[in-house]
């Protein structure tokens, strides 16, 4: 026998489950007037925050001042052919006598035809080679980076090899080049 109340409340329960609760970092950003969107936390419960490219540097500067002094990882990925590219930043608050470090991941969604984003090198020097790798593999241009050039591929390489719409050069073309 099916309980009618359970059936009637199913859409409401789905809506409540779809609402992402603001975590401590997002709440702090909202209290201080920083525009951002919440994404669902990852499988470890790390807060995910979406921000537009224009607000990346002000938001990251605020997070640095708030104590997120360690850029653990910067990377990028492709959502698929014709879809957006994503640049992400995994930040950690490192402090003395901390039992559990606070973490947050910032994501910036970029159009694949013009993937420009400001560099965070001037906030976290660890972004240097990580942004270069994202540029080299996905073609994301980090405006203001002091030395944005290829880091893994030869400098004369054509294209962005980790984009999902990348067409690999023929093996023999590569072999003949050397």
From Swiss-Prot:
Topological relation to the membrane, as annotated: Peripheral membrane protein
Keywords: Membrane, NAD, NADP, Plastoquinone, Quinone, Thylakoid, Translocase, Transport
Catalytic function, reaction form: a plastoquinone + NADH + (n+1) H(+)(in) = a plastoquinol + NAD(+) + n H(+)(out); a plastoquinone + NADPH + (n+1) H(+)(in) = a plastoquinol + NADP(+) + n H(+)(out)
InterPro entries registered for this protein in UniProt: NADH_DH_suC (IPR010218), NADH_quin_OxRdtase_su_C/D-like (IPR037232), NADH_UbQ_OxRdtase_30kDa_su (IPR001268), NADH_UbQ_OxRdtase_CS (IPR020396)
Location of this chain's protein in the cell: Cellular thylakoid membrane
GO biological process: photosynthesis, light reaction
Keyword Transport: yes
EC number: 7.1.1.-
Main subcellular location: membrane
Gene Ontology cellular-component terms listed: plasma membrane-derived thylakoid membrane
Coiled coil feature spans: none
Disulfide bridge positions per record: none
Regions crossing the membrane: none
Pfam families linked: Complex1_30kDa
GO terms, molecular function: NADH dehydrogenase (ubiquinone) activity; quinone binding
Keyword NAD assigned: yes
SUPFAM superfamilies in the cross-refs: Nqo5-like
Function: NDH-1 shuttles electrons from an unknown electron donor, via FMN and iron-sulfur (Fe-S) centers, to quinones in the respiratory and/or the photosynthetic chain. The immediate electron acceptor for the enzyme in this species is believed to be plastoquinone. Couples the redox reaction to proton translocation, and thus conserves the redox energy in a proton gradient. Cyanobacterial NDH-1 also plays a role in inorganic carbon-concentration.
Subunit relationships: NDH-1 can be composed of about 15 different subunits; different subcomplexes with different compositions have been identified which probably have different functions.
Listed NCBIfam families: PRK12494.1
Family statement: Belongs to the complex I 30 kDa subunit family.
Protein name as annotated: NAD(P)H-quinone oxidoreductase subunit J
Species, as recorded: Crocosphaera subtropica (strain ATCC 51142 / BH68) (Cyanothece sp. (strain ATCC 51142))
């Amino acid at each position: 026998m099916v309980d009618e109340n359970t059936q009637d409340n199913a859409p409401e329960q789905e809506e409540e489950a779809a609402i992402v609760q603001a975590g401590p970092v997002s709440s702090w950003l909202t209290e201080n007037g920083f525009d951002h969107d919440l994404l669902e936390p990852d499988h470890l419960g790390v807060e995910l925050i979406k921000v537009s490219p224009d607000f990346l540097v002000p938001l990251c500067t605020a997070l640095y001042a708030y104590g997120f002094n360690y850029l653990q990882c910067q990377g990028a990925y492709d959502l698929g052919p014709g879809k957006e590219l994503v640049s992400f930043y995994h930040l950690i608050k490192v402090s003395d006598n901390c039992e559990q470090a606070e973490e947050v991941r910032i994501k910036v969604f970029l159009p694949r035809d013009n993937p420009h984003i400001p560099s965070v090198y001037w906030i976290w020097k660890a972004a240097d080679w990580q942004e270069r790798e994202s540029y080299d593999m996905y073609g994301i241009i980090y405006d203001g980076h002091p030395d944005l050039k290829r880091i893994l591929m030869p400098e004369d390489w054509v294209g962005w090899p980790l984009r999902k719409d990348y067409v690999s050069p023929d093996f023999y073309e590569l072999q003949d080049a050397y």
